[in-house]
Amino acid sequence: MKYFLAYNSWSKTEIAEVAKVLKSGNFTMGKKVYEFEKKFAKYFGSKFAVMTNSGSSANLLMMSVLKYFPKFLKKKKIKNPNIIAPAIGWSTSYFPISQCGFKIKFVDINIKSLNISAKKVEKAVDKNTVGILAINLLGNPCNYNRLKEIADKKNLILLEDNCESLGSKYKNKYTGNMGLMGTHSLYFAHHIQTMEG
């Protein structure tokens, strides 16, 4: 038996919608994207949504906001700021951290959920820690009660890479909305997709 990473699941309606976009000559941004952003934000209970070409780019955008708009950081003027991240994730979760000038401080996972261990996070926080990146792996939400508690106590920002868990909930709230910012992915191999995004 063969298992494919992805396969063509486009309906006639979806193909017709893609054709409309192609015929319009407006391939990026535009009315359809604006409508999607508004509906996406409303559905998932977020104030805002910004569409990018991929979850990888969304992660880079999220970290760039912290680099270029440090007012969002709770700790100011840290010389060597670090962000705590789980030891299991995707390279596209980690590269943006270092690309934007932050050090990555890896911590171990909880073996039952495969997500970041709140106990390990608490022990890893030091004077240069400015944030926690929680990655909701394979539809499993992190322990946000504990992560928020740690972030509040230690004056840190909480960020989410929700690219692998669109539609997951933690205590009746969609993941991707637990911290300051969260990212999602609609890549072709995911359960809900827009081809590349």
Task: Report each predicted region and the residues it spans.
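Phosphate-binding glycine-rich loop
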Residues: 26, 30-82, 96-100, 106, ...
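PLP-dependent aminotransferase-like
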Residues: 68-153, 157-162, 169
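Conserved donor-binding loops in enzymes that form glycosidic bonds
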Residues: 7-8, 87, 137, 185
